[in-house]
Amino acid sequence: MGVRAQQKERTRRSLVEAAFSQLSAERSFASLSLREVAREAGIAPTSFYRHFRDVDELGLTMVDESGLMLRQLMRQARQRIAKGGSVIRTSVSTFMEFIGNNPNAFRLLLRERSGTSAAFRAAVAREIQHFIAELADYLELENHMPRAFTEAQAEAMVTIVFSAGAEALDVSPEQRGQLEERLVLQLRMISKGAYYWYRREQEKMAQNSDK
């Protein structure tokens, strides 16, 4: 990559980080202005268009980055699990670390999931589906269950995880710890339920085949 290309990439990165830094519990992406983001990134507003067509393209890039960041962290968690440790507890701890270290990235996913922009809703839905699919892959490999079962289990788990994440955004460390324990319990209940449901279905199939 040439010097100019590197500089352009650094500036683009600065714009993304500037936009993330301006999000908060009180401020959504929709309230950001191009001028504010450009000023925070240290460039002229007109220079913004060298990197993004408009503010919406910047926002969609942020959604993609947030989803990718979360999936990469969860992949790392699964690598830690492979070396020994509780699957659910390690995954929940990793997720809560993501919330603590990247609150605005998670806020963006939560808000735009049900926001007014169809493009943003679709982008967040796509990221969540990636997340569900990767978890379903892992469950299928580890639990030797059919895809239909692991997808249903993964979807239920992700729904509860995102709900807990929303609660964990603006609470004290002590409250976040309590949320983490509750989430571990809920996910274990889903996991056990999925396992016994699958066993029951297998038993039914075996009984029917014997008739």
From Swiss-Prot:
Residues 10-70 form the HTH tetR-type domain. GO terms for cellular component: cytoplasm. GO terms for molecular function: DNA binding; DNA-binding transcription factor activity. Residues 33-52 bind DNA. The keyword Repressor applies. Signal peptide: none annotated. Gene3D superfamilies: Homeodomain-like (1.10.10.60), Tetracycline Repressor, domain 2 (1.10.357.10). It comes from the Bacteria. Keywords: Cytoplasm, DNA-binding, Fatty acid biosynthesis, Fatty acid metabolism, Lipid biosynthesis, Lipid metabolism, Repressor, Transcription, Transcription regulation. It is found in: Cytoplasm. InterPro entries: DesT_TetR_C (IPR054129), Homeodomain-like_sf (IPR009057), HTH_TetR (IPR001647), HTH_transcr_repressor_FabR (IPR050692), Tscrpt_reg_HTH_FabR (IPR023764). PROSITE patterns: HTH_TETR_2. Pfam families: TetR_C_46, TetR_N. GO terms for biological process: fatty acid biosynthetic process; negative regulation of fatty acid biosynthetic process. The keyword Transcription regulation applies. Represses the transcription of fabB, involved in unsaturated fatty acid (UFA) biosynthesis. By controlling UFA production, FabR directly influences the physical properties of the membrane bilayer. PANTHER family: HTH-TYPE TRANSCRIPTIONAL REPRESSOR FABR. Homodimer. This is HTH-type transcriptional repressor FabR. The lineage of its organism: Bacteria, Pseudomonadati, Pseudomonadota, Gammaproteobacteria, Enterobacterales.
